[in-house]
C-alpha cells in the first residue's frame, strides 16, 4: 500500500494506492497541476526577510510506501520542482540533463 500526501497552501489531501505505478501516476498528475498554477510573488520586505518565489515551497507531494519508502516533490513559487528521498533527513535527487524532477524521482524509485 502506498500513500500520497499533497500539501498546498494549508490544505492536506491524502490518497492511497495499491501499486507504486499508480502512486507515481497520481503524483505526476498533481505535480503538473501545481507547476502550472499561478503562484505568488516575493513575500516579506521592509522588516521581515524577503523570500523570492524560488525560495518558497507552494506545494509538496509526499510518497510513503513499504520498507520505509519516503520520497516526494517540492514545487517552488516560480514553478520549478525538486525531487527528494527521505523525510527527516532529506536528500535531493540529482536530475540528469534534460530530465524533469518527476522523471528523476521515478527513475530513482523504479531502479
Segments the model singles out, each with a brief description of its role:
Residues 1-13:
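Short aromatic-glycine-(Arg/Gly/Cys) micro-motifs in beta-strand/loop hairpins
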Residues 10-22:
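A short, exposed loop/beta-hairpin motif centered on an aromatic-Gly-Thr core
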Residues 36-111:
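Short, mixed-charge low-complexity intrinsically disordered segments
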Residues 19-35:
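A short, charged, amphipathic alpha-helix used as a generic interaction element across diverse proteins
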